[in-house]
């Protein structure tokens, strides 16, 4: 679990002389999978000031069965956001967007945003919210294209 793997900013449980060779992911449980990732950095290939990744699984009707959203670059650790929302890929987009924005904003309340010479905490929060919405939207669009 990521919560146990990261022990500090830029630090993991892996000793300095060790090398990570493999990461295993669970096989998706549902027929349709969508992913999205967005980040922002001061320069190309710099560490992210904020990043968001989404992984969504839906059944054959387009009902989302699993939505995972994580953010990074905004606090000491990358973290998964606890989202409490029901989404149907074929549902009303405006309604979905509104409910998603509300759910993401509520989930971000639990994050301790860092402030440093690169960005303020409030900037990181605003950007993380937008990147999270974009990542989820990309994942939903990917699923929508896959549905019959």
Language-model-detected regions and their locations in the chain:
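C-terminal structural segment of proteins
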Residues: 1-148
């Amino acid at each position: 679990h990521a919560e146990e793997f990261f022990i500090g900013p830029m630090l993991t449980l892996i000793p300095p002389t060790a090398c990570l060779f493999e990461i295993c992911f669970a096989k998706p449980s549902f027929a349709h999978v969508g992913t999205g990732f967005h980040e922002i950095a001061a320069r190309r290939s710099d560490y992210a000031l904020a990043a968001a990744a989404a992984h969504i699984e839906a059944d054959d009707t387009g009902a989302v069965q699993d939505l995972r959203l994580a953010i990074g670059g905004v606090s000491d650790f990358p973290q998964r956001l606890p989202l409490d929302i029901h989404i149907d890929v074929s549902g009303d987009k405006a309604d979905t967007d509104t409910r998603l924005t509300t759910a993401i904003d509520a989930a971000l309340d639990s994050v301790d945003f860092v402030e440093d010479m690169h960005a303020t905490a409030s900037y990181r929060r605003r950007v993380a919210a937008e990147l999270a919405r974009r990542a989820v939207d990309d994942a939903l669009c990917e699923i929508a294209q896959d549905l019959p």
